[in-house]
């Protein structure tokens, strides 16, 4: 088997590559084809735990360990009805500062690559990237490949490992998508095409106009003029979708109000600079009566029923930022009034009394003091899926008692009771051994488990409601591209 490769390129970041790749995965899966997603390199602090080759108990060439990939490829794999694995995103860069990222190669952190200059690193990792793609091609009918940024970044072309080098290696049929809502869409499409070498232009099979608002007839005669200049047709005009139902790949989610009917629960998520795994809160946007918003100042948490401290790629630095904004006092006051506070992973660590770092992973410092816990950072990273059952949860979070939840862990920290405080009887109630605790008052909850709100049982327990399933989201995306692509284009792309 040698898969047909279909690649989604963009004229800019944010053009719509990720959601279109996801829609294509479900569309071709619905045609009865075996489909896998692929993105050579992703830069994101939104990651998921998936199968990785090797590890204790694995067969030769099999999967028995766990690793990380970008969340976008995880969701694309689910859309494709494929088992997510590290080959689908062989290189993941997790930013830790403006000029430094943790490098994850085939699911595992590589300290050597993390210290290596970017241009030198690209050539070193290309063989593993190509091998991962070739393996997926050998096992599937279709591989849907996502590019990154723009393929026409001419200053980066010589060291490219994520756009046209991948397209050439796979001889992929490429769709070039642009965000027409920003303006200048036809210039973006033509300029991107014109900056590519002739052999790479030949791989562009169609242009896609995304996020269109208005009367499509008003676009004429521009699509035909563009085709006359390039030989490439506009194969789809996709209407604006204010909420396609997928988590944002990077940055923060769109927090415009969408609660249907009366709002009964206002949830503020603290948006510190190195936030991670924010995609796990996407289901809350779709729960009836819930209003989800970002908090960057004390005013943003005023009137909130819940405050969530999400994961962080730099816990100590983000905690310092939080204090500089005055959010520490606002969160403490909210908790003192009995308001709910939830800390996930890095957020859990912040809620404790202290951060201790003897290995240079994150940093030392005092915590917020809302849970009598202390976190020690270790060089070894815990990466694994986890299924656990909440114990005797009390107070404001009592509806979680006895609920079994499927999630995942990605953390360097190990958290335990503060020894001195425990000796005096001030202890946190442990709800899941080594993973979840709450304060004696019952309104502050901290846990290492990501994915809490992606579990239907949790949503029912906390809100008495269900959010739309991911499968329904995938089907909606697939139906949308089937309507808006020109007839026959999607079938032709997948033909060998």
From Swiss-Prot:
Domain GATase cobBQ-type: 264-458
Membrane-spanning parts: none
GO molecular function: ABC-type vitamin B12 transporter activity; catalytic activity
GO BP term, example: cobalamin biosynthetic process
Keyword Protein biosynthesis carried by entry: no
Keyword terms, alphabetized: Cobalamin biosynthesis, Glutamine amidotransferase
Active site: 345 (nucleophile), 450
CDD domains listed in its UniProt record: CobQ_N (cd05389), GATase1_CobQ (cd01750)
Pathway the protein takes part in: Cofactor biosynthesis; adenosylcobalamin biosynthesis
Iron-sulfur keyword on record: no
Domain of life: Bacteria
PANTHER family assigned: COBYRIC ACID SYNTHASE, DETHIOBIOTIN SYNTHETASE
NCBIfam families in alphabetical order: cobQ, PRK00784.1
Protein family: Belongs to the CobB/CobQ family. CobQ subfamily.
Function: Catalyzes amidations at positions B, D, E, and G on adenosylcobyrinic A,C-diamide. NH(2) groups are provided by glutamine, and one molecule of ATP is hydrogenolyzed for each amidation.
Protein name: Cobyric acid synthase
Organism: Acidovorax ebreus (strain TPSY) (Diaphorobacter sp. (strain TPSY))
Gene (name only): cobQ
